[in-house]
Swiss-Prot record:
It comes from the Bacteria. The gene is rpsF. Keywords: Ribonucleoprotein, Ribosomal protein, RNA-binding, rRNA-binding. It comes from Geobacter metallireducens (strain ATCC 53774 / DSM 7210 / GS-15). This is Small ribosomal subunit protein bS6. InterPro entries: Ribosomal_bS6, Ribosomal_bS6_sf, Ribosomal_S6_plastid/chlpt, Transl_elong_EF1B/ribsomal_bS6.
Length: 118
């Protein structure tokens, strides 16, 4: 059964471009070989961590949004667990697609100039 997932991966902040491209290729290859559908792979950049992980105070965040089955998520997490460059990862099954609520604009009441002067 195909389900929707999103995964956030935190890697070491000092990786070079070749290593980052290799990590991106690894994730896309796993999803492709397990017959998944990759929707989004975003680099969120280097951010400060809430607490040090492996003596590192910063980490590079990646967001991956894909469709797949349970075998795909198990294989992806297994490969991420074995990679020394990955500090942490978290995969979540998306139950419902939620759209951002439209911002409500309250009408601004302006007092007439005559009333404001009194």
């Amino acid at each position: 059964m195909v389900r929707k997932y999103e995964t956030v991966v935190i890697v070491q902040p000092d990786l070079g471009d070749d290593e980052l491209k290799g990590l991106n290729a690894k994730v896309t290859d796993i999803i492709a070989t397990m017959k998944g559908d990759l929707h989004r792979l975003e680099d969120w950049g280097v951010r400060k961590l809430a607490y040090p992980i492996n003596k590192s105070a910063r980490g590079r965040y990646y967001y991956v949004r894909f469709d797949g089955d349970a075998a795909l998520i198990a294989e992806l997490e297994r490969r991420l667990r074995l990679d020394d460059k990955v500090l942490r990862y978290q995969s979540v099954k998306i139950e419902k697609e939620t759209a951002a609520p439209a911002a409500k604009v309250a009408p601004v009441e302006t007092a007439p100039a005559a009333e404001a002067a009194e």
